[in-house]
Amino acid sequence: MIHIENIKLYRNEKLILDRLNWQVEKNQHWAILGLNGSGKTTLLKVINGYIWPNEGKVQVLGETYGETYIPKLRRRIGWVSNAMIDNLNWQDNAIEIVLSGKFGALRLFEEVSEAEIEEAVRIMKQFNCDHLANKTFEYLSQGERQRIQISRAIMANPDILILDEPCGGLDIIERENLLQTIEQIAGRENCPTLIYVTHHVEEILPCFQHVLLMKDGKDAATGTREQILTEPVLSNFFGRDVSLQIQRDRAWIAVK
């Protein structure tokens, strides 16, 4: 699904990604954990073909970057992020935002069929946001906007769905509701490969069986959640002693 081989990326002579390696296989769901400035979002931009590494090899969905037509490939990758929200037209109704995902556009310019509208409503209903269909996007809460954005991504029937810090700015209730939505996606038949990016350990749901730790643009560690979500590994990663508890199959940490 994703093959990143020894990539290096510079911006203004600063090394952003440093000999990073990462491989995602079919039917795997991954969490990427890293502090601010670790290179997480830059890696996502590389995967989506928005920026190119200076060295190394990138393959996504069997296509090698530099040898394929990126805009066409990009339609097979859903990306949910706060940066994407800012690019949407906030004056559109929620269902128009969702329908735009069908065409890989930021606005709905195409004529849509009754079947496509029904599909959008069905997807929104799965994520408990169909009642928002005719609401103006601008007046939705942050949590509601994230549900609409996820519905928009699913509308395109992607092979990979990237969730870039989707809980950022949410209160604890909205966060848990959104995480429940993500669990629902993971439990769906023919679910896309999920990539969940965060700097909060407790957001790594049980469905994310593999974890990539990123630090200073490097792959600090990769492995199963059982291998990575341990006190020794996380203490070394954060550079501080942490205690870890497992509650509801999720890891919760505190600095000692």
Predicted segments with their positions:
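Catalytic Walker B motif of ABC-type/P-loop ATPase nucleotide-binding domains
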Residues: 161-164
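Helix-to-loop junction immediately C-terminal to a conserved catalytic motif
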Residues: 48
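Conserved ABC ATPase signature
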Residues: 136-140
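Conserved ABC transporter NBD signature motif
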Residues: 56-66, 73
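Conserved ABC ATPase "signature" region
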Residues: 99, 114-132
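Conserved structural motif at the start of ABC-family nucleotide-binding domains
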Residues: 2, 16-19
